[in-house]
UniProtKB/Swiss-Prot annotation:
The lineage of its organism: Bacteria, Pseudomonadati, Pseudomonadota, Gammaproteobacteria, Pasteurellales. Residues 22-91 are periplasmic. The chain crosses the membrane at residues 4-21. Keywords: Cell cycle, Cell division, Cell inner membrane, Cell membrane, Coiled coil, Membrane, Transmembrane, Transmembrane helix. One of its GO terms (biological process) is FtsZ-dependent cytokinesis. Residues 1-3 are cytoplasmic. NCBIfam families: PRK00888.1. Belongs to the FtsB family. This is Cell division protein FtsB. Part of a complex composed of FtsB, FtsL and FtsQ. It comes from Haemophilus ducreyi (strain 35000HP / ATCC 700724). GO terms for cellular component: cell division site; cell septum; plasma membrane. It is found in: Cell inner membrane. Disulfide bonds: none annotated.
Length: 91
């Protein structure tokens, strides 16, 4: 009887050790859970960025306003009936 209690005690200790400290145990589970949360948050940010880029691409393909806005901001272009004034600071 005493041998059986010792055997089951050691068996319980072995399983508890492997659960808490062993490979694929509690620590690995917690680390994997944190990694999944981090990657999920990163995916949400990337999806939002992709939606903005897709909307901008769609606007550039179908609309004239976005193309005109890009020409004005990036290339400093003006229409034929407009005047462009550049104010240069005194440094």
């Amino acid at each position: 009887m005493r041998l059986m209690i010792v055997f089951f005690g050691l068996l319980l200790f072995f399983f508890q050790y492997s659960f808490w400290l062993g490979k694929n145990g509690w620590q690995d589970y917690k680390n994997a859970k944190l990694e999944v949360q981090r990657l999920t948050a990163e995916n949400i940010k990337l999806n939002a960025r992709n939606e903005l880029i897709a909307a901008e691409i769609d606007d550039l393909k179908n609309g004239v306003d976005a193309l005109e806005e890009r020409a004005r901001l990036d290339r400093e272009m003006v229409k034929s009936d407009e005047y462009f004034y550049r104010i240069v600071p005194r440094n």
